[in-house]
Amino acid sequence: MTWTLDSSIKAILFDKDGTLIDFDRTWSVINRKAAAIAAAGDGLLCDVLLNACGMDPLTGKTRADSMFASANADEIARHMVDHGSPVAPDALARLLDQAFVDGADAAVPICDLNLVMGRLTGSGLPLGIASSDGEASIRRTVEVLGLTRHVSFIAGYDSGHGPKPEPGMIHAFAAHLGLSASQIAMVGDNRHDLAMARAAGAGAAIGVLSGTGTHQSLTELADICIASVADLPDLLAAR
């Protein structure tokens, strides 16, 4: 039997990187900068930190469910310190957060997001974004890509709802709309997104294969996997 979205779904919550944003084209440069900051000028250590956080220094590709793929700045900073960064973890987290905000100006969308989001909001579905990035970086990305009119809710790891894969971001989005978590569909490219959906009791956990996750890594937690968010309006239209 083919799985379809239930008609009880009333809103969509998106992950950002790998879901709305082309992960490698956007983040390979940012993550190299992050590793360079953490390495404090040590080129060899920079490559060690890139590998430790999940990015191949040669190809710029990031592994599914690695630190760079799913963790927040605080978690990445502490992981980098554990792997040799001489920078104090709290100071490094602040530096990484700023690097991520700066990098938002070069965000590459995964597809025509205005078209996709316009179709979704036009059908009466409120949209939100929940990311392991900081809230300031998410807001900057939304502004740069001209998506502000489509997005009614934004949550980052530092917004007060807890980090992924805890359920708080989904619960906050539902409360913002006066809905229950079971009326929310979560869309994301890694296991943290889908685990958050399961923990929150979301109505749907939709995996996208446009980011760091694979069908193999996502299928255990996803109700369905689609190529990218470009396929979402048609999936919803079939309800």
Predicted regions and their residues:
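Conserved phosphate-coupling serine/threonine residues in phosphotransfer and NTP-handling enzymes
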Residues: T19, S131-D133
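Residues that cap or flank secondary-structure elements
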Residues: F68, V108-P109, A130, H161-G162, ...
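N-terminal helical cap/lid subdomain that shapes the substrate entry/recognition surface
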Residues: S7-N114, R119-G122
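Asp-based, Mg2+/Mn2+-dependent phosphohydrolase catalytic module
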Residues: M1-I12, R25, A40, G118-G122, ...
